[in-house]
Amino acid sequence: FNDDDDQTRWFYFKSNGKKLYADNGERTKDKTINGKKYAFDEYGAMVAEWSLDEDDEKKASDTEAQEAASTASTSEAWEGNGKYAKYTQAWKYYNSVEDGSRVSKGWFKVVPAEMLNKEKYDDDEESWYYADGSGNLYAGEFKTIKGKKYAFRNDGRMLTGLKFIKEGDEDFADVKADDDDSRPFDNEDDFFDNAIEFYEPNGYKCYYFGGDDDGAMRTGKTTINYDGENTSFYFEKSGGKKGAGVTGEKDDKLYQSGMLLKADSDDKYIVVDKATKTVNGKTVVTYDKLDDAKDFMDQDDVVATNLLENTTADTRVNIGNNSNKKAEDLTEAYKISFTQSDEDVKHEYVLVNTSGKVIDSKGKNKDGNDYYYVTDSKGVITNVYV
């Protein structure tokens, strides 16, 4: 719709001299002219920009969507509610008032209709859309276009950047951006906190769709400029979860929702907490970075026995892997064992280095605070000392 009363209007007159217009209660009347599709309203004026197709509107069959189509007053219509994708698919775009021909197939970048997204309409913010060949929008779905996979919000806007998506039965139940008001993930700490505590347990998957004018879904190993730094991610390369961020081990490295868990250059080594629990009848595994050796030994499931108690300077202390040191040469020394403090959650602790490589062999690994993590032949931490 275009509400500018002062603009020039185009009309089409049939061979009998009568103008073409929508009648019999129709919203618009379609006409192919010189191979292009146009639409005319009840007054005969050519439709420009956005139009809601009356026949296609029947796709919006559920009660809430019909209400949104008639009142356009509920915020859910542009907040990612999966019930409204079919309503969006009933919209078509007819270019400018000077042109008016329908975009039948392909990409176009415009400001959304007010009834599709009032906030973006008020801000005069353009977004990318795709018409399916009949002029209808892709909405609430993944689509492969010329060999590349894209995703479209329920209001039709192409997705870009890093997103958490929860799929519904027919469309997207929810899409979260990194600046989400309640559960943001625009820095590493918030990413891990919210991915672990909310997104993964509730069925969301992390995807990356490139920059504002790109939108193509990434797969495999990907470097993203995230929070001002180049950050490594890994997204599924095939199968039903193609494009979803990997949670788990891949090529001897650990990922949470696609983000690589690794020590920074100052820390050298960090411990990752692998937690396994059941949520809504499903097994959920999450991975979280611990701050340092002290944080590791403070975990409820970790028992750190002080080996320097009741020793003298010359006492030989077993620091792991059949190695001994004099007590006077040690500042701290602990024997590490594990228990299960919560019967509903199983914790395992994995040591990783600055490349994210899982330490899975026998050795002594010195972190940035001069703590040594002693690991057995399977990479299990048996001792910590400094």
Where on the chain are the PLM-derived regions?
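Extracellular adhesion/carbohydrate-binding repeat motifs centered on closely spaced tryptophans
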Residues: 1-386
